[in-house]
Amino acid sequence: VTAKTATHELFDARLQLAPYSDGGIPLAVAAVASPTGARLAGKHGIGLLSIGATLVVEGFDALAYHWGIVEERAAAFGTQVDRNNWTLVGPMHIAETEEQARADVRFGIEPWFRYFQKVAAFPQMTIPGEQVDEMINIINDAGAGVIGSPERARIQVQRLWDQSGGFGCMLQMGHEWANPLATKRSAELLAAEVIPHFQGQAEPTLAVARRASEV
């Protein structure tokens, strides 16, 4: 970049750090339940960020047809789209056991609920619940998120995969339900015990172990 401003003059300036991803900065359109976000993503040939994938029933239901809208609009406008650029968003806190996860989120889940109930007050994100145990049960029973073991997290991701027909990225919604140490441990368990289940990195060694045990 060569440019002159009131305070700086640049001569063939360039960034010293390469981007984290190939092809430049990824762009995406946010969507909850309406077709608007999906239509825009298809029109402009960019990613789709489904921020209502788990928190609202309408957002989960929309996963069944949103990508079809993206592809339809892409065909109409001559753009290219890829399911790998579809990101689903949802809150999770996992621990070694469900009991530990439930204990962890007592740190901050109540203020999170109160925010959606009293401050943000989004009509499409009305979340009931008065006591902490009730709040945890609502999150888990409604599929709005995950508070539990890695197995519960795997079930949730599979549920989203089946509903959507496939997507590229599962993005954890920041929530501060637990303290920083427990939150870090949750991320470690997600990386070690949930993500490999779907990406298949461990399958070759697991398959060999199964074969060896059958001899």
Where are each of the predicted segments found?
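Active-site-adjacent structural elements that line small-molecule/cofactor binding pockets in enzymes
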Residues: V1-V215
